[in-house]
C-alpha cells in the first residue's frame, strides 16, 4: 500500500517524538514510524534524574510513553513498523517498511538513534543471551544474588552497575583507564556502594563459560600495561562501552562522517540532501542526552515547517 505524507519521521526516541509534537502542532499531519525499539534508548533506562520538569526521579519507559501519548494527542499518526529501505534520490522521498508498505514523503526527519557497542570478541558473541547483555533493566533480574561484571567507564556503565546492585550479590566494574568519565554524582554513588568494586586499567580478554548448560562462569581480564591476565568469576557480563549511530539505512545516500554519524549543517538539522533532516543521537556525537535529542527534534520540526512553506 502506498501512503503519502508531508512529513515522515523515522524513529521514536526523544528526538522523533519531539519532532512529531512540533510538526503536528504546525498542522503538517506527520507520520512517525516507531522502528524496532519504540521509545529508543530511554526505554532501557530505569532512573531518569536529569530531564527538566520532574522534581523526583522518573522512569525512562514512562517518560517515553508520555511523549508518545502527547504526540498522538496533537495529531501524529504513529505506525508500529520499521524501515527496510529508503530512496532519497529525489522528492517525494520513498520509504519502504518491513510490513510491505511504501511511503512517499515531501520531507523526512531521521531520528534513528544509536545502538549498543560490543567488544567484538568471539566469546562475547558466543555467550550473548546466555550471560552476556547490554541492558541491565532487561536482564538484571536473571542474576539475582549472583556476581556480575560491568564493562565501561561512562554514564551508562555506572548507571548499569548501580541498577544491578538491586539484584546482584556483587558488581565488579572493569574499566580500561584509571578514572571514569561519568558524571561526578554517579561516581560518588558508585564509590559509596558496598556492593560495587572497580578494577582499573584492564580490558576483557575473554568471556569464559560452560556449554552444559550454556552459561557464563567468568571473564579473563588483561592489564593494559603489563598484559597480565587474571580471572574474575561471575555469572553475567554487561557491556556498556557506548553506542553506534543507526545509519546503515542511509549509506551512500546522505553525507555520513567517519564515525557513521549523519553530518548536519552547523547550528541546523539539515543534512546533505535538501528536505532531509536529522535529529538526536544519530547526528550528535558530543552531547547525547535525552534533553538535547528532544531539543534537536524540535529544531528539525521547525526547519521542516519552514522548508515546506517555501
Curated annotation (Swiss-Prot):
Provide the leader sequence positions.
none
Major place of localization?
Answer: cytoplasm
Origin, by domain of life? Bacteria
Keyword tags: Cytoplasm, Disulfide bond, FAD, Flavoprotein, NADP, Oxidoreductase, Redox-active center
Q: Which SUPFAM superfamilies does the UniProt entry name for this protein?
A: FAD/NAD(P)-binding domain
GO process annotations (BP): removal of superoxide radicals
Pfam families linked: Pyr_redox_2 (PF07992)
The keyword Kinase is annotated on this UniProt entry: no
Top enzyme class, one word, equals: oxidoreductase
| UniProt binding sites for FAD | 34-41, 281-290
**Record's keyword annotation contains Cytoplasm:** yes
What other note does the entry give for this protein? The active site is a redox-active disulfide bond.
- State whether it acts alone or in a complex, and with which partners, per the record: Homodimer.
Know the name of this protein?
A: Thioredoxin reductase
Which classification does the entry list for the species? Bacteria, Pseudomonadati, Pseudomonadota, Alphaproteobacteria, Rickettsiales
The protein's gene is named trxB
